[in-house]
């Protein structure tokens, strides 16, 4: 009998140990609830901060179509190319409706090309077109002329050559409209520069080719002087 009691004691103790491990003490439960509540607070705070940051950024940097037109103009409309190949030319048109004749005469429009890193690569100044030249460039001719009493409508065109050495990728076009005494009006648009394969030709300068320039015969002299 004594031996049997001694033999069953380890099993009973192991069962009690398992039951003890399955039951959490009140302090452990409080710690778990505290950690869980802290995680929920941190998650809510992160979502709240992200939402506030997005709203502040949207309010501070409005999209180009919502920018306020300067007081010198009634309307400013711009057309930018979306993509262009290496070695080609990018053309942008600007339809500006000035409120006064002097503002139309002194308006300066510049087109800036920026690299993917944001650095200025090239800047050109747009030139004004006469009303008859608007339709030839494909611009809506209905926008030409006077939009309302006293306003002056003029179209500018900027031509920007794309170098064959510029890397293809996502670049940025930046238009700047300036009037003396007023704040510049800036609008940006993405420009995709596509890679273009150019044919390669080689001309070997051997003795046969260089002998042509050294030919002093009368027949070659007549050909060169013609």
Curated annotation (Swiss-Prot):
Residues 1-20, 205-226 are annotated as: Disordered. This is Uncharacterized protein TP_0703. It comes from Treponema pallidum (strain Nichols). The lineage of its organism: Bacteria, Pseudomonadati, Spirochaetota, Spirochaetia, Spirochaetales.
